Amino acid sequence: MTDLTGGFGVDFSFTSCAFASATYVERNAQLCHMVEHNLPLLGIDNAKVVCADAVDYLSTLDMQTMIFLDPARRDQHGAKTVMLADCTPDVVQLLPQLLKKSRFTMLKLSPMLDWHKAVEDLQGTVREVHIVSVGGECKELLLVLSEEIESELKVFCADLEAGDSSLSGGSSGSSCSSLSSEPSFPRTPSSPSASSTPSLSASLFVYAPGSSCPAPNSKLKTQNSKFLHEPNASIMKAGCFDELAAAYGVSPVSRNSHLFLSAEPVDGFPGRSFSIERVTTLNKRELRQALAGIEKANIATRNFPLSVAELRKRLKLKDGGDVYIFATTTAEDEHLLLISHKYQ
């Protein structure tokens, strides 16, 4: 494999372990010297360091199993860019060469990027999209390109948390089609030094955009639901709400709420689940009864006319505690507060 945007060598030090030989390419000579010094210390003896421009070196490459690129996300003035064509190097312009020179090309992109637009810009060559979140925040967007393998596009939504190294949430979350959760490109084996790094637990949901999914169950009403489910950051970035509802048998509160309901607990839901204790409108009398005994709460708004700060001021509640209040608007255009506690 070849990493054409080597940088500090962090990505390279992990990906290189999955290949018999690996090449680090970086035009900054100082970084090249640093990585050349660090690789033996990391126990990586299958790699070579090349100080060269990525575009120039690409033209000299023989066929590779994988080419990795993490294009610079700032323009010549230092401003952040989120459009694929504005990154350096321009992978859209380099696409024909990348496909010709490798079985797989992996792009590491800004989580702010519109991945649907990126897939479109890359002209049907994207085989996999990996959306990776850590601790509730979307951190990375990875695209895997190939002309060699013709298959439907798969989207992997991964959410990582510090903990044990188990995988929860099911290997393939989508019931819309029979999908394998295994990526089609080589995976990095465990590093010898893995024991020195924090272990992770991960929730994984896999789906195929455009697959025929059953319509989400909208019969379940907010007022008589017992459980509330909030998708994780990767699901939110993917926007796969119909697929999620079909896979787990949950009902959307409304089209734009991105909250889901169920009458029973849902095992392995990729996100947070809550038990609903009370449901109230903004009617003063109802609010007084529903909030009796509650002095502080964690408040979130989803498709709701008030901000969190405005609602907190109106409810006169402090921040924190074990009560969670979700303010949202139902499909019937009714503003409701769902007062809940974390489930398990």
Feature-to-residue mapping (PLM):
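SAM-dependent transferase fold signal centered on methyltransferase-like domains
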Residues: 1-344
